[in-house]
Amino acid sequence: MATKIKFKYKGQDLEVDISKVKKVWKVGKMVSFTYDDNGKTGRGAVSEKDAPKELLSMIGKK
């Protein structure tokens, strides 16, 4: 089963499949990421404690 990342962006509750995530980096206690949003680049962030371990393992990798 594919992992989904749930996060808030600009007041909206969003969810993205981890297979669409392109880049992941850490900012303080937050994990930020970009993802493919149907041809556009979407952005998201989730707290380190709420991030799935699959996302944490992608930090710094392309």
From Swiss-Prot:
Gene Ontology molecular function: any one: DNA binding
Pfam families: 7kD_DNA_binding
pH dependence: Highly stable from pH 0 to pH 12.
One of the record's GO cellular component terms: cytoplasm
Domain of life: Archaea
Keywords: Cytoplasm, DNA-binding
Keyword DNA-binding: yes
Signal peptide: none
Temperature dependence: Hyperthermostable.
Cell compartments where the protein resides: Cytoplasm
Transmembrane segments: none
InterPro entries xrefs: Chromo-like_dom_sf, DNA-bd_7a-e_arc
Function comment: Can constrain negative DNA supercoils. May be involved in maintaining the integrity of the genome at high temperature.
Family: Belongs to the 7 kDa DNA-binding/endoribonuclease P2 family.
Description of how the protein assembles with itself and partners: Monomer.
Name of protein: DNA-binding protein 7
Lineage of the organism: Archaea, Thermoproteota, Thermoprotei, Sulfolobales, Sulfolobaceae
